[in-house]
């Protein structure tokens, strides 16, 4: 008797395409949303750091009597 082999990645891909379109769409949406949150937080932290640098420069100028 010959052992029958199945191509598991192909079966999983076909199942996703036939039965899991909504799940696949939601998975992509979740990954995209998480990526956008990370990018937004990163950019916000950069802006906060930049703002703190500007405030420190203003304080130094005030302490030196330049303003």
Swiss-Prot record:
One of its GO terms (cellular component) is plasma membrane. Essential cell division protein. It comes from Buchnera aphidicola subsp. Acyrthosiphon pisum (strain APS) (Acyrthosiphon pisum symbiotic bacterium). It is found in: Cell membrane. Residues 1-21 are cytoplasmic. Pfam families: FtsL. Keywords: Cell cycle, Cell division, Cell membrane, Membrane, Transmembrane, Transmembrane helix. This is Cell division protein FtsL. Its main location: membrane. The keyword GTP-binding does not apply. InterPro entries: Cell_div_FtsL. The chain crosses the membrane at residues 22-42. GO terms for biological process: cell division. The keyword Nucleotide-binding does not apply. Residues 43-67 are extracellular. Belongs to the FtsL family.
């Amino acid at each position: 008797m010959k052992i029958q082999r199945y191509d598991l990645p192909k079966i999983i891909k076909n199942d996703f395409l036939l039965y899991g379109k909504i799940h696949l769409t939601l998975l992509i949406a979740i990954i995209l949303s998480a990526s956008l949150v990370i990018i937004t937080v990163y950019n916000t932290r950069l802006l906060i750091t930049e703002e703190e640098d500007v405030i420190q420069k203003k304080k130094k100028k005030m302490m030196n009597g330049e303003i």
